[in-house]
A protein has these predicted regions:
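Active-site bordering "gate/hinge" segments
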Residues: 1-212
């Protein structure tokens, strides 16, 4: 049976080899919450082992974002930092692979004016339009990893102490991502082949509509 450390390493390896498909000489951008430092370091190591030229980091913190939205004026919130947008846009234009490590953000918007929250999202999407366009059109490779938090784990496993709840949530994530397989990377390659075969089969049938 794999240890937690071994599973975490396989999780990081999947992100690099399958999710982002990092190539030799490619730059990599990792966006992650500060609580995920251990995972970020492992992903970074795997990226360099895969031949990454450089790895850049974009750190986030829900509590700091909460404070910003709570205290900043709408005028300030409507002004996205130009340097930050330029940095992200420059990286994707250079073909950087993007690896996002995300949490659920439970409670982040508690007590925040909905108008401010909506304005913040609108401002970000407008400023990062080119960056997101590169990703959504698959002009760069990108992937998303999930990182469990205590708040999320306690929501799912309310009867357990925080440490056990987080451990159980990790196991759910490892199972969903095939990390619990003997060879997770090969398991995903096999899964991709299965999907491709099914797509080919359905396309050859030339179905016009489905009734169910």
């Amino acid at each position: 049976m794999k240890t937690f450390a071994q599973k975490l390493e396989k999780y990081a390896e999947l992100a690099v080899k399958v999710g982002a498909n990092v190539q030799k000489g490619q730059e990599v951008l990792i966006k992650a919450p500060i609580d995920a430092g251990e995972l970020v370091r492992i992903v970074t190591e795997k990226a360099y082992e895969a031949g990454a030229k450089r790895v850049f980091f974009n750190w986030t913190d829900d509590k700091l974002d909460h404070l910003r939205l709570k205290h900043a004026s709408e005028t300030v919130i409507s002004e996205y930092p130009v340097w930050k947008a330029n940095k992200l846009e420059d990286l994707v234009k250079r073909g950087a692979a993007c690896i996002d490590i995300r949490t659920t953000g439970i409670g982040m918007m508690d007590g925040i004016d909905p108008k401010k929250a909506a304005l913040d999202q609108e401002t970000m999407w407008r400023a990062l339009n080119t960056y997101y366009d590169y990703r959504m059109s698959d002009r760069v490779s990108w992937t998303i990893l999930i990182f469990p938090t205590v708040e999320w784990a306690k929501k799912l496993f309310p009867g357990k102490i925080r440490e056990l709840a987080v451990a159980d949530l990790w196991e759910v994530i490892f199972k969903m991502t095939r990390v619990d397989c003997d060879d997770p990377v090969q398991a995903w390659e096999d899964h991709k082949k299965t999907l491709a075969n099914k797509v080919s089969f359905l396309n050859k049938k030339k179905y016009k509509r489905l009734h169910y």
